[in-house]
Amino acid sequence: YQSAVKQGVNFKLGMRVQDLILNDKGRVIGVTATDKVGNKYEFTSKDGVILATGGYSQNKEMRQKSAPHLTPEMVSTNQPGATGDGIVIATRHGADTTGMNYVQVYPLATPGTGALQGRARKMSGLDDVIDVNKNGERFVKEDARRDEFVAAIKKQPGGVVYDINDSSIVKPLNSFNEDVETLVSIGRIYKADSLADLAKQLGMPADKLEASVAEFNKMVEAKNDPKFGRKLFDRPIVKPPFYATPRAPSIHHTMGGLQISTNAQVLDKKGKPIPGLYAAGEVTGGIHGSNRLGGNATADVLTFGRIAAKSAVAHK
């Protein structure tokens, strides 16, 4: 944001885009918008409009229509503005969509809120962590694809599982710069000097949790998971205190969206570009197939954002 401001970009905050503006030749030349109190505005451009409005994970109506296998009660990891407005507006003017039924669910979010935060560990990987159900048992390889992981969690009691790790990967602040001891004090994280005490706090059989950790420690030494086929290992879980973080699935990324060309032009239902309309990022579909790989959305927005800008300036 600061870099863009230095380059002369004029941000209009507190606005919601309502529609596109087209000239008499059918080219998109701007947008209409309203502010928080309902005042109406028009913004025009000589080069066109780039939609970068994100996905629709927070739009339950659109979500359920596109992916009815998801329950309306499911929360999302995303910010409240991920309501698919760009898709709604563009399709109003004939834009085509693709892959709208592909919605990715993140397996290990905060129960109830869907937030990614709230973990005990400083490091974000799973190499030093196991996940257990309410019975204290592992149920999946922790490095599984997200859709496989989610499917496995849904079969567990209550649909809630626990990250289990030791203090070797814990710092005063976690990977989201949250104070770990504060999270413990408010009950977001459980902490104990022994696995038995940790199991007691979680209401699970101590012998089951201890057995799961012992089994994992053997796997780390052998670099082999005979039960589930896990491939990623680093350190055993041996150093007290031990931590448990409740986790549950949360809607994370919508792979479907507007159909675009390789020049980031928004296409109509006949596969032809809508003049002056471009799109990049999660508002588009088809880039990530049926199941996005973690981190690839960054490459998506950087690549197609640049392509969209170049195409708009060139009036492609």
Name each region found by the language model.
Residues 105-110, 147-150, 249-255, 283-298:
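Glycine-rich phosphate/pyrophosphate-binding beta-alpha loops
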Residues 87-89, 96-204:
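An anion/pyrophosphate-binding glycine-rich loop and adjacent beta-alpha core
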Residues 36-110, 304-307:
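Glycine-rich loop(s) and the adjacent beta-strand/alpha-helix scaffold that form part
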Residues 77-79, 118-123, 154, 247-251, ...:
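Short Gly/Pro-enriched turn/cap motifs at secondary-structure boundaries
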Residues 73-76, 181-182, 291-296:
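Short glycine-enriched, charge-decorated loop/helix-capping segments at active-site entrances
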Residues 19, 208-291:
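A glycine-rich dinucleotide-binding beta-alpha-beta segment and adjacent secondary-structure elements
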Residues 1-47, 87, 91-93, 258-259:
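Helical element adjacent to the flavin cofactor pocket in flavoenzyme catalytic cores
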Residues 86-96, 202-205, 210-213, 301-316:
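Internal hydrophobic alpha-helix adjacent to the cofactor/substrate pocket in enzyme cavities
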